[in-house]
């Protein structure tokens, strides 16, 4: 009897060990160019007919370029496991994407590794970067090859320097090779609040150049400061010079420049 119990323990131990080793092996050899490591606190499921791996419970996919965490992550691959490569990742519930300079959170995201496009959807999307924090209520698309990020749906970006807020329906962000934000373009129902200058500006479009430290406003510009209101077609806020200017092509409109 004791011998049977002892034998069962050995078999159980070997089964657990073999399962762990096999999971670790295919989880780290899914891509023959970029190595991935897939972890999960509950279990990893391998659907061979669908070429799919599912990680459940505190799931994590990690490479030398990025990391994705979520309650559940699905990985789709081409070819045979260990010889093929992952082509797509889907993260569900409490999903988080992290690269060198960009952190994105939402309840759902898809990452096309072949096209290098991250698609994030949901009504509570957040992103942080070297520039500040951003929130959106519809979608975020990060096209790495184009070095651009597109956000849509009641977008709010809170800048660290200068201390200000930009509201818009859509936002287009340009980044450099190191993922630092260089340019932010706000489109549709734009409202910019500049705390340091005590200005509140409305326009059709606004473009913040992080390198030149300027914001350019275009179309139906309304600049409010204290009790003063100025209207025009274009405006520029130069943070380096501490200069605000508003101009218009209409002769009847007021043009003002003040420090």
Model segments located where?
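Bacterial N-terminal signal peptides
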Residues: 9-22
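N-terminal secretory signal peptides that target proteins for export/translocation
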Residues: 1-6
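N-terminal amphipathic/hydrophobic interface segments
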Residues: 25-259
């Amino acid at each position: 009897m004791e011998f049977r119990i002892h034998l069962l323990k050995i078999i159980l131990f070997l089964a657990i060990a073999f399962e762990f080793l096999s999971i670790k092996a295919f989880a780290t050899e899914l891509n023959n160019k970029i190595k991935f490591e897939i972890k999960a606190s509950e279990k990893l499921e391998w659907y061979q007919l669908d070429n799919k791996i599912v990680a459940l419970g505190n799931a994590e996919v990690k490479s030398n370029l990025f990391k994705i965490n979520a309650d559940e992550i699905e990985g789709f691959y081409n070819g045979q496991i260990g010889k093929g490569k992952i082509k797509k990742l889907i993260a569900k519930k409490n999903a988080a994407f992290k690269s060198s300079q960009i952190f994105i959170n939402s309840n759902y995201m898809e990452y096309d590794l072949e096209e290098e496009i991250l698609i994030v959807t949901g009504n509570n999307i957040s992103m942080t970067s070297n520039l500040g924090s951003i929130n959106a209520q519809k979608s975020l698309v990060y096209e790495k090859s184009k070095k651009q990020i597109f956000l849509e749906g009641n977008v709010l970006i809170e800048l660290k320097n200068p201390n200000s807020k930009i509201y818009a329906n859509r936002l287009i962000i340009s980044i450099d090779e190191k993922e630092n934000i260089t340019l932010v373009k706000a489109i549709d129902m734009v409202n910019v609040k500049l705390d340091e200058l005590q200005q509140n500006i409305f326009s059709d479009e606004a473009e913040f150049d992080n390198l030149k430290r300027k914001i350019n406003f275009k179309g139906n510009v309304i600049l409010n400061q204290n009790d003063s209101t100025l209207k025009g077609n274009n405006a520029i806020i130069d943070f380096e010079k501490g200069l605000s200017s508003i101009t218009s092509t209409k002769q009847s409109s007021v043009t003002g420049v003040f420090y």
